[in-house]
């Protein structure tokens, strides 16, 4: 529940704050552009002036969206995808046991799958051979971005480097009400995965991926598939990029205390907002806590897990610790990659920070690691 809503999230204060932001921000960025010509003044000295300014602008935007509680700042309705859009109903209740079970408030719901580059084949024999990536996008559980301007470049990169036929852009429900807190996003992940399997796609040809909060959802789906007694098969593997693994009651404060956080693209306010509305109210069971915040809650995985983090991101050390904990579980196959001088969420930020080469290398490495014969 969003009990800490800022004053600026309601009219007329939202309009006033928006006007102030639109006037102030260009001036602020101009002043930073001048200040950052002096290398010691740059938050990240190894980055160029332009890269530091872009990171500052991202922090300002995240802070602004958090202040006015704007959940779809750059959004494209799923219906705009036309024939690539599929409205998917959730599977029967038996597929939602334990921590993801329906409650009086949080229940499985229909989801919108967006296919790239085109809808799946109707030929069952052909579909069985299709290689499909199920990708969960980031957004701190509270922000959704356009499946075109944001989703298409990510889908194109995944298709190319993972040698996949199709990518499903899987936007789960955003949190913000008691009906959309955990386990809503994981229930949606189960619905997406069940949908792809029910089409006839061979699970050995499915890779689950996610970035930032979407990486958290991908890890939660892996935990569910490993632990639940449902008959959903395991995918080939899981690849996550800058996964948000430490979703605590004090997420914003935790982030600010991390090295590199003040230079990265994220702002602590968006993480605190996300944690406030994603985490259910009251005392959580150990099982629920493990799903929400997987750091310090490693689990057995029968499929390989690839984890990437940027060495310049505020979440780097948390993600590395999560990877080490997962790798310590007997039988787990985990590969962690720290990408040099890279901010949070390489798939999302690679173009703005000139990291296309690094993204390609990371995806190629992930693909090789997740190969069945590896």
Regions found by a protein language model. Give the residues of each.
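Short hydrophobic segments within beta-strands
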Residues: 116, 135-139, 209, 241, ...
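General small-molecule cofactor/ligand-binding pocket signal
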Residues: 114, 168, 335-339
């Amino acid at each position: 529940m969003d009990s800490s809503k800022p004053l600026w999230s309601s009219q007329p204060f939202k309009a006033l704050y928006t006007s102030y932001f639109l006037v102030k921000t260009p001036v602020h960025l101009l002043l930073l552009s001048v200040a950052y010509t002096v290398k010691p003044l740059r938050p990240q000295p190894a980055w160029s002036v332009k890269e530091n300014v872009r990171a500052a602008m991202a922090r300002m935007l995240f802070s602004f969206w958090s202040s006015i509680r704007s959940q779809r700042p750059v959004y494209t309705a799923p219906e705009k995808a036309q024939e690539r859009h599929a409205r998917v109903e959730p599977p029967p209740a038996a597929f939602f046991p334990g921590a993801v079970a329906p409650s009086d408030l949080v229940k499985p719901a229909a989801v919108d799958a967006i296919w790239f580059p085109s809808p799946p084949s109707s030929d069952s024999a052909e579909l069985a051979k299709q290689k499909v990536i199920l990708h969960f996008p980031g957004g701190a559980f509270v922000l959704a971005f356009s499946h075109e301007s944001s989703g298409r470049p990510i889908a194109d990169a995944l298709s190319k480097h993972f040698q996949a036929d199709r990518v499903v852009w899987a936007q789960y429900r955003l949190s913000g009400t008691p009906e959309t807190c955990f386990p809503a996003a994981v229930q949606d992940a189960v619905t997406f995965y069940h949908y792809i399997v029910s089409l006839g796609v061979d699970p050995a040809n499915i890779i689950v991926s996610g970035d930032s909060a979407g990486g958290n959802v991908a890890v939660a789906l892996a935990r569910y598939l490993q632990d639940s007694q449902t008959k959903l098969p395991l995918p080939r593997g899981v690849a996550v990029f800058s996964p948000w693994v430490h979703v605590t009651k004090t997420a914003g404060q935790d982030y600010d205390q991390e090295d590199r956080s003040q230079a990265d693209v994220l702002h602590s306010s968006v993480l605190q907002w996300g944690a406030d509305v994603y985490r259910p109210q009251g005392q959580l069971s150990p099982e629920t806590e493990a799903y929400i915040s997987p750091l310090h809650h490693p689990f057995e995985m029968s499929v390989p897990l690839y984890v990437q983090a940027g060495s310049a991101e505020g979440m780097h050390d948390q993600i590395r610790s999560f990877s080490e904990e997962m790798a310590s579980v007997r039988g787990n196959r985990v590969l962690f990659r720290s990408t040099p001088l890279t901010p949070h969420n390489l798939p999302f930020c690679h173009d703005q920070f000139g990291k296309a080469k690094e993204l390609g290398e990371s995806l190629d490495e992930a693909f090789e690691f997740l190969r069945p014969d590896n």
